[in-house]
Regions:
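Intrinsically disordered, low-complexity regulatory segments
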Residues: 2-190
Length: 190
């Protein structure tokens, strides 16, 4: 929604002085920032989910707000779990497969959303140096992860333990912290 005050170019209105978005862009895109008097950490939400919620509220079809909206990242297919009030666990994905000659391999197909291939390769090199894994092969293409790991120490563990050992899980607590007009500290976590 634009204000009635517009900037002009060559005497013609071209853009609003102030633009108030109808949808909360910080909630949709996520944000992790600080400013004078506030700090926020918000994980992204799917725009369709937020839009449907707003339309339902405005039309009166949604009267009870959901207690939470799970975060959704583009291109991320890992598991998202609510651990506590506004605390989320973001996990990668692994599979144990039987390869040639009965040898087991661990395939990483997803990593936490704040990771990239360089972070993963660095961790794998460290695990190789420490002896946790014997070797790995990177078959990743573009935005897809496909890493094959050889590890006799990990291959017989359940997938959740493999995720833990390979540090393929992270947790994030969402918050909005600010000072009120009377200089009182306020933390919003709802």
């Amino acid at each position: 929604i634009a204000t009635h005050s517009y900037r002009t170019t060559e005497g013609k209105p071209c853009e609003p002085e102030t633009l108030y978005p109808i949808l909360p862009i910080g909630v949709i895109n996520g944000q992790n920032q600080i400013g004078v008097g506030f700090a926020s950490t918000l994980l992204p939400r799917k725009v369709e989910t937020v839009l449907d919620l707003f339309i339902g509220i405005l039309q009166g079809t949604i009267t009870n707000l959901p207690s939470y909206l799970p975060p959704e990242y583009p291109y991320y297919n890992g598991k998202v779990d609510l651990l506590d009030v506004n605390k989320w666990s973001l996990k990668g994905k692994v599979q144990v497969e039987v390869a040639k000659r009965g040898k087991k391999i661990i395939r990483i197909t997803e990593v936490p959303p704040n990771w990239d291939k360089y972070i993963l390769i660095k961790k794998l090199e460290d695990f190789k140096d420490s002896g946790l894994i014997e070797n790995y092969q990177n078959n990743s293409v573009k935005n897809t992860f496909n890493i094959e790991i050889s590890s006799t120490k990990l291959e017989n563990l359940p997938e959740d333990k493999i995720l833990e050992k390979l540090e393929l899980e992270t947790s994030v607590t969402e918050s909005f912290v600010y000072y009120t007009s009377d200089d009182k500290f306020q933390l919003e976590c709802k």
